[in-house]
């Protein structure tokens, strides 16, 4: 029985890796996501090195793909929060207008994060592929509810 479960798990993992995390688009500009790399096994494997459990690693990977799909071709930054223990989606700020070089949650969105029993993982993008800003670092250091903060760049670079 254990062999069947392991085979099923391996098949499931293989199928997940074969599916594109971000779709192809016809137009490209300076803010376009590097689709080929983002859809690669090498990119997926970066998430397996994160210091969280496998379910959370996979959730971070999926939410990062969803984030990059949303901002592909745009200079604005957006953000997603997930539960750091379960990987469950908490909130994102995709529904409103974004800003270039900064992002934040509204008070109502942040309240959803504060209501979480567990710590959270924040994921946001840097469309110009830059390192985490001073504000990114301060937010992470000053909010004890944040377990992990990830910056996903459009070129496939990840900062944690």
Regions found by a protein language model. Give the residues of each.
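Short, flexible loop/turn motifs enriched in small residues
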Residues: 71-77
């Amino acid at each position: 029985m254990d062999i069947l479960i392991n085979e099923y798990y391996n098949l499931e993992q293989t199928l997940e890796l074969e599916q594109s995390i971000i779709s192809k688009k016809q137009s490209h500009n300076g803010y376009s996501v590097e689709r080929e790399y983002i859809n690669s096994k090498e990119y997926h494997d970066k998430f397996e090195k994160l210091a969280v459990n496998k379910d959370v690693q996979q959730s971070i990977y999926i939410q990062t793909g969803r984030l990059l799909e949303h901002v592909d071709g745009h200079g604005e930054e957006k953000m997603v929060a997930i539960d750091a223990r379960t990987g469950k989606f908490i909130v994102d700020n995709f529904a409103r207008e974004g800003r270039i070089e900064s992002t934040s949650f509204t008070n109502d969105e942040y309240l959803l994060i504060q209501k979480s029993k567990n710590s959270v993982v924040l994921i946001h993008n840097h469309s110009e592929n830059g390192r985490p800003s001073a504000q990114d670092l301060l937010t992470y250091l000053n909010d004890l509810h944040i377990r992990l903060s990830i910056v996903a760049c459009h070129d496939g670079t990840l900062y944690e």
